[in-house]
Swiss-Prot record:
Broad enzyme group: lyase
Name of the featured protein: Siroheme decarboxylase beta subunit
Job of this protein: Involved in siroheme-dependent heme b biosynthesis. Catalyzes the decarboxylation of siroheme into didecarboxysiroheme. Siroheme is decarboxylated to monodecarboxysiroheme, which is in turn decarboxylated to didecarboxysiroheme.
A Pfam short name: AsnC_trans_reg2
Assembly information from the UniProt record: Forms a heterodimer composed of AhbA and AhbB.
Catalytic activity entry: siroheme + 2 H(+) = 12,18-didecarboxysiroheme + 2 CO2
Superkingdom to which the source organism belongs: Bacteria
Keyword Lyase among record annotations: yes
Any Gene Ontology biological process: heme biosynthetic process
Keywords, comma-separated and alphabetical: Heme biosynthesis, Lyase
Residues that bind substrate: 152-157
Pathway it works in: Porphyrin-containing compound metabolism; protoheme biosynthesis
Length: 159
């Protein structure tokens, strides 16, 4: 079900999709930019969250500056009957931020479930891989390491 965003909603989302104002009163500053009151902005954001039109509202932290310097995308060989249970168990791990199921159409690529693992060292990431293997029926996997970050931005939905 899609949500038709009003001009007022779009105005607020256009501002918050970039960055919140760096001040002691970010919502008041945001309201001023949008031509609204702070109460109106808070009500609008609360309504959008409650309706499911926005999933979450929070800070993006530069993980490298907090010591989380390693990550690994792990591709797992999974059967269709394993996906829900194994995906749920993997998602419970605190070092895993994303779990996706993507059916493969490539005959030489048997991996269909992907987890994004974060750690403070390569050994910590590898330990998470072992934890997933121990707590699920998943065994066969491929670890895809990033060689270079080419782009990392948040999506812009309203311009």
């Amino acid at each position: 079900m899609s949500h038709q965003f009003s001009p007022e909603e779009q105005a607020v989302l256009r501002i918050v999709q970039a960055n919140l104002p760096d001040s002691l009163t970010p919502y008041a500053d945001l309201a001023e930019q949008a031509g609204m009151t702070e109460a109106q902005v808070l009500e609008l954001l609360g309504r959008l969250k409650a309706s499911g039109a926005i999933r979450r509202f929070g800070a993006s932290i530069k993980h490298q500056k907090t010591g989380w310097t390693h990550n690994a995308m792990v591709a797992w060989k999974v059967t269709p009957d394993q996906v829900d249970d194994c995906g749920r168990k993997a998602a419970e791990h605190s070092h895993i931020s994303h779990v996706y199921y993507r059916p493969s159409s490539a005959p030489d690529w048997p991996y269909e479930m992907y987890t994004m693992i974060h750690g403070r060292s390569e050994a910590e990431c590898l330990g998470v891989v072992e934890d997933v293997k121990r707590t699920t029926s998943l065994k066969e996997h491929a670890i895809l390491r990033s060689l270079k970050e080419l782009k990392k931005t948040s999506m812009t939905y309203f311009t």
